[in-house]
Amino acid sequence: KYELIVLATPTSTHYSLAKFILNGSFNLLVEKPLCLTVKDHSHLNSLAKKNKVKLFIDFPFIFSGSINYVKNVIKNKKFGKLKSIESYREQAPVRTDTNVLWDLSIHDVSIIEYLIGSSKLKITNIVKKEYEKNNYSEVQINLSDNKNLNIFIKNKWKSPTKIRLIKFVFDGATIYCDENESLYKIKIYKSVKNRFNQF
């Protein structure tokens, strides 16, 4: 018997194929997004519990060293309270089987939930730019949690440059986490009397 099946097919096929695999009592790893509706998502979760198998979604960035460094900083309050997060993820292949929310924004949300240890994020504002009916190529999202943390996410497929940047603002410093950097993915700017010193 297989220990795990990996599903990496067009998004529109995820629900039906995942349902078939889970009903066969196999552990399953699905390439994001899991499916296209909350209803289908809930049903797959229920199937996994019913068949006593595990259902995973592919969120690779939560395993990166730079993201886990920031998680440590937040946990230990090294620079005081975390006040805001800004995440920018731009330039990726335009897809017809899903939209930019499910393709890119889902990464930022998974990273932020992992870092702050909360899945109770609330959307306070969202701006979407369509390139065809019901398919979004660009989004800007404002989120908040129950600790008054301000969160901003901007994603777009079409961009002249590839951007994978998250900015974390603390009481005592600002951290830039840039996954595009090959060497120094983390840059820290410490607040000193209304100015910033890099260290």
Model-derived regions, located:
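Beta-loop-alpha module in the N-terminal Rossmann-like domain of NAD(P)-dependent dehydrogenases
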Residues: 1-47
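Alpha-helical elements of Rossmann-like donor-binding domains used by nucleotide-donor carbohydrate transfer enzymes
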Residues: 4, 16, 20, 43, ...
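A contiguous active-site-proximal alpha/beta segment in oxidoreductase catalytic domains
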Residues: 12, 35-94
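A short helix->loop->beta-strand "cap" motif at the edges of active sites that frequently abuts
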Residues: 24-26, 51-54, 148-149
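Hydrophobic residues in well-ordered beta-strands that form the structural core
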Residues: 30-31, 55-57, 177
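Mid-domain beta-loop-alpha active-site segment that forms a flexible
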Residues: 58-65, 91-122
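Contiguous beta-strand/loop segments that form the cofactor/metal-binding neighborhood of enzyme cores
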Residues: 106-184
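C-terminal helical cap and adjacent loop that interface with cofactors, partners, or active-site loops
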Residues: 195-199
